[in-house]
Amino acid sequence: MPLLVGAAILALVCVALVGRGAPGDDLSGRALPADAVRDVVPNRVMTWNLCNPCDTDDADRAAQIAAYAPQVVAVQEACARDVEKIRNHLENRHGLVYHVAYGTVLRNWGRCGGKPWSPGAYGQAVLSAAPMTDRVDVEYPDGGSEDRGYMAVTTTVGGRPVRVFNTHFAERRQEAVRAEQAAVLAAEVARYDRAIVLGDFNAVPDAPELGRMWALAADADPRCRPSSAGTCPPTTDWHSKFDYVFLRGIAPLAHRVLPTPYSDHHLLHADLGPV
């Protein structure tokens, strides 16, 4: 009889210690799926306009990123709360751990929710497997129809520090505004011998407003050039190339453009050579 009582007490203690999970528990205590990626692909960088507002689950966005496991991810049209959820899903569901830096250009309740008196942050973000330093967040003097800007961080790619930029230029028929934005961005990029410039430039390769960028850097796709002879796969659902991985002082090894059901912009990633 004492043995039975002791066993019962031990069982109750175990239940009390393990429990059923308190409200607010996240996935961090759950086993990762058997097919979890668990590690990033070194020297792979990605850019993706998330599409906002779009009715897309952040778990699906995270799964798309995890499928290619880039070392550095730049996202545009991003709400800070969504990026945080994406980062959590990447770690808890896919075993990929990222640092995150934000480049907020505005606070917009319609785009990012929040409270009327404290709307959510909207803009760009960079996720990096390696730590990031020296973050800057710059709003262009003229955003056009909506505030726009660029952010930049320093992180390690190929074993060396590299400046990484993430930007989103003005949309539609605002060529003059984009030209001014390109001038601001190019002046900063020119300060670095090695730089990766990612983003949605809202301009096709031969658009005059991109001339300053082409003078400083090359596309990760060697066939893509700012001339009629260039061959540049589209990166949007409307069959235009608006998204770029510009490289300065870094050679590309491979690149891919990947349509996705979760945005009107395709995923674009590049594998980089020695930095």
Segments from the language model and where they lie:
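Metal-dependent phosphoester-hydrolase catalytic domains
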Residues: 1-3, 14-35, 187-195, 203-275
